[in-house]
Amino acid sequence: MSENGFLFRFRDGQTYMDTWPERKELAPMFPEQRVIKATKFAVKVMPAVAVISVLTQMVFNNTAGLPQAIIIALFAISMPLQGFWWLGNRANTKLPPALASWYRELYQKIIESGAALEPMKSQPRYKELANILNKAFKQLDKTALERWF
């Protein structure tokens, strides 16, 4: 199986969710924060919704409603998977030119501050942007970030 395989998208989505900095400054510019919040909520709540939808039909001995309850349960179980899938696709998407130049500027700012980074990517993806943003928020002071936020 290649790195672009089906299951790798889910793994990349989970990694990207953990990597993306949850900062209020980024919320208006990127949908990641909303998707991450919805995915975390779905991971907590949707398994219970799936179980309750099936169990209520079984408790009330409603065999006619059981197929619909199973469909609802499958949909509820798929909700967190949809979030991980979206995040995995987003993590591996190349940055548009404007964001790529922003990535390069942030990279140079962090290097100038004396931090060690992995080599700059020629065609960065959103997961590299997430790593750079994390480093920027941790290493740079607020005055250095004023230009962008």
UniProtKB/Swiss-Prot annotation:
It is a multi-pass membrane protein. GO terms for cellular component: plasma membrane. Pfam families: DUF412. It comes from the Bacteria. Keywords: Cell inner membrane, Cell membrane, Membrane, Transmembrane, Transmembrane helix. The chain crosses the membrane at residues 41-61, 69-89. The keyword Transmembrane helix applies. It is found in: Cell inner membrane. NCBIfam families: PRK01816.1 (NF002493). Belongs to the UPF0208 family. This is UPF0208 membrane protein VF_0838.
